[in-house]
Amino acid sequence: MRPTSSRQNPSVRRLIATAVTTAAVATVLLAGTGAGTARAVPAGNPGPYARLSPIAELSARRLATADLVAAAKWGTGGPVDDPVRERQVLDEVAREAGEPAATVRIFRDQIEANKDVQRALHRRWDVRPSEAPSVRPDLAEVRAEINRVNHALVRAIARTAQDRGAPCCGGVLLASAVQAGGELRLDAPHMTALHRSLGSVCRP
């Protein structure tokens, strides 16, 4: 069955609720940062976990939107890849970032991880049509939520210039990702994608 445009399906409502929660978290993280380019700030009193964990949390919440994006694209005949949209995202974060090159590398991983989940879901729905979504979320609305998370993630990255080069970065991100994935009840494919999304956060 191909999906129809509707918001009455309970599973889609749950996914939209996750996106709304994502927007709320993004709003909190953005509060007080002001507009314009995100600049790296010196490490304050909080430890590396407190500074790095928002990157893992926001990455997990961004990844959770892949289910909605996959549902929106399902049955349209179009590909998962959207080079125009991807370039728009990368150009926007480059303009906002204090470290454009590093931030763009991180967001490339974010985009590829999101597409990994979309493809996995489409393969599952091809094999198990009964699990496929019966309604199609509004992709523009979903992307608006993703954009809010993107803004917060750019700022979270900017706050961690020193921590991303520290020896503890990888371990802290791993622990943060496990916690964030558990809170969102991400399954194995989502967790694999989450780890991919964080692959360029720590500097060599």
Model-derived segments and their meaning:
Residues 126-160:
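Extended amphipathic alpha-helical interaction segments
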Residues 72-77, 121-124, 128, 160, ...:
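Secondary-structure edge/capping motif, primarily at the C-terminal ends of alpha-helices
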Residues 1-41:
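Secretory targeting and sorting signals
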Residues 57, 61-64, 85-92, 105-116, ...:
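Charged, amphipathic alpha-helical oligomerization/scaffolding segments
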Residues 44-81:
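Immediate post-signal-peptide N-terminus of mature secreted/exported proteins
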Residues 71-98:
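N-terminal, post-signal-peptide region of Sec/Tat-exported proteins
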Residues 2-3, 14, 163-204:
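Glycine-rich, aromatic-bearing surface loops/beta-hairpins
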